[in-house]
Amino acid sequence: IEDFATKVPQSMKSEYAAPLFCAGITAYKAIKAAEPELHKKIGIFGIGGVGHMAVQFAKVENCDVIAFSRTQNHLDVAKRLGAMDVMIFSENQEEFLGKLKEKHGMLDAAIVFAPADIVTDTAIKSVKKGGLIVIATVGENPAFMAFEEKTIRGTLIGTTKDMEQVIKICDEKNIEVISQTFPLESANEVLKKLKDSEIEARAVLIP
């Protein structure tokens, strides 16, 4: 079992560490997949339990982050955590892309955490020719123009080595983890809250 365990510093609280083993490593791998050393202007689509951590990992890599969400409170969180700019996502794709291009031009890379095909399709169209799209959610792959030479890459989870890096970065860089704690016996109620979007980011159950 030691091969699959990751040591957590004694100074790190369990309720802080718990989300790192799901949301944290997913966010970290998505940023690494976006090749931040080459792509500095990164759009993050979906600022929830995973996206808010991705904003911070991208900042550690000195990227300019533009965050997109349907809800203003998520955008406020992204801005507080270091996003260069934030924009409300709109399903009016032409209008949304027009505003993005006017403010920032085309993105070097886009990362999709929101599980909606319209979001993925919009993210693909927001990236410049030769750019990179990382899909970190499950959904259909919309059609895209091959002659634009864009790369689409999927990612969901990482390795034990990746997890060690997540713990190290979060410990050294004071990455903020947004979560709410609940007693273990309220698990069913918490699942309903998650389903109804009543929890801002992640829920942690305490025995």
Feature names for model-found ranges:
Residues G131-L132:
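Glycine-centered, small-residue-biased loops immediately flanking beta-strands
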Residues V127-K128:
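Helix-to-beta-strand junctions that scaffold the AdoMet/dcAdoMet cofactor pocket
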Residues I1-F45:
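NAD(P)H dinucleotide-binding glycine-rich loop of Rossmann-like/cofactor-binding domains
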Residues T137-K150, T155-K168:
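Rossmann-fold NAD(P)-binding glycine/threonine-rich loop
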Residues D121, M163-P207:
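C-terminal hydrophobic helical "lid"/dimerization subdomain
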Residues H52-V55:
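Residues forming the Rossmann-fold NAD(P)(H) cofactor-binding site
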Residues K41-I47, K59-T122:
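Adenosine-nucleotide cofactor-binding segment
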Residues A23, G46-V50, V138:
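Glycine-rich Rossmann-fold phosphate-binding loop(s) that bind the pyrophosphate
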